[in-house]
Amino acid sequence: MNMLLEINDLNSYDIEFIFDTAIQHFNNSNVSNNSLYGKTIVNLFFESSTRTLSSFEISAKSLGAHTVTINVSTSSMNKGESIIDTVLNINAMNPDLIIIRSQYSQFIKEISKYLPNCHIINAGDGHHEHPTQALIDYCTIRYIKGKIHNLNISICGDILHSRVARSNIRLLSRYGANISIVAPPTLICNLKGVSHIHHNFVEGISDSDVIMLLRLQKERMTNFTISSEEEYAYLYMLNYENLSYARSDVIVMHPGPTNKGVEISHYVAEKKSIILLQVKMGVAVRKAILEYLLCHKLVKDMGNIT
């Protein structure tokens, strides 16, 4: 595998390797190795990021790679250079891998056509996909629950604008999860792999094994999709009271950033969620992805083990 642009780029072997390797890293998070020594990884983020960018940088450095993060606000794009020329110039410097985030859906897939021999990771493109976040959530759920098959997973919030929702639905439904999406009618879209659509929040989370919350992406909203944050919170915020309708061992997830008091109460975020565990798993999973893309010999040798 040369690139990770979409969840469907991964087959079952790819996912199993990433899961097994990620859990090894997760259980040995204080242990560094030099599996990527001598590799150069460029982070090229055209959209703001805290967790994803930091997670990739920490993952790469802990594996011995050299990282270069391009500050787009001070790059030659401010002098009129096009995005494609920026990417082509960076690629001409022969980095081993480029990690790209863009506000434009499908942009990274289009860019990849100009870079057939370069390793590329999609760190999120518009509302299209965020494959590494879906892998993090998959690994987190499987780590805690021991499986994905037949779990009732409720994804709640701004489905319409969410790349995380799309990638998660594609991945988790492949492994047999029963996925419900829960949102106002104006924030819903038809997605393959969804079992149920709910506009009533309590109905949507009833009997859930996993509740995955998503923030309102106001920066992507071009039409009048909600009347107010206050009304949205009244109808769709997960709080102490409505959490009781889910299963007693439910896990509450959020890819971040959270808007406490809107989609999740302070109490649930701080006392009942596994948000920080997801962040920790994020470093482990991204280590595994980097190794899978860049350590070809390691993967080949593992594939020959009988």
Curated annotation (Swiss-Prot):
Keyword hit for Transferase: yes
Binding site for carbamoyl phosphate: R51, T52, R101, H130, Q133, G256, P257
Biochemical pathway: Pyrimidine metabolism; UMP biosynthesis via de novo pathway; (S)-dihydroorotate from bicarbonate: step 2/3
Any one Gene Ontology BP term: 'de novo' pyrimidine nucleobase biosynthetic process
Alphabetical list of InterPro entries matching this protein: Asp/Orn_carbamoyltranf_P-bd (IPR006132), Asp/Orn_carbamoylTrfase (IPR006130), Asp/Orn_carbamoylTrfase_sf (IPR036901), Asp_carbamoyltransf (IPR002082), Asp_carbamoyltransf_Asp/Orn-bd (IPR006131)
GO molecular function ontology, one term from the record: aspartate carbamoyltransferase activity
Keywords: Pyrimidine biosynthesis, Transferase
Pfam families: OTCace (PF00185), OTCace_N (PF02729)
Residue numbers binding L-aspartate: K79, R163, R215
First-tier enzyme category under EC: transferase
UniProt keyword annotation of Hydrolase present: no
Cellular compartments per GO CC: cytosol
Superkingdom assignment: Bacteria
Catalysed conversion reaction: carbamoyl phosphate + L-aspartate = N-carbamoyl-L-aspartate + phosphate + H(+)
EC number(s) on file: 2.1.3.2
Alphabetical list of PANTHER family matching this protein: ASPARTATE CARBAMOYLTRANSFERASE, ORNITHINE CARBAMOYLTRANSFERASE, MITOCHONDRIAL
Subunit structure: Heterododecamer (2C3:3R2) of six catalytic PyrB chains organized as two trimers (C3), and six regulatory PyrI chains organized as three dimers (R2).
Role according to the record: Catalyzes the condensation of carbamoyl phosphate and aspartate to form carbamoyl aspartate and inorganic phosphate, the committed step in the de novo pyrimidine nucleotide biosynthesis pathway.
Family: Belongs to the aspartate/ornithine carbamoyltransferase superfamily. ATCase family.
NCBIfam families from the UniProt entry: asp_carb_tr, PRK00856.1
Protein name, UniProt field: Aspartate carbamoyltransferase catalytic subunit
Source organism per UniProt: Ehrlichia ruminantium (strain Welgevonden)
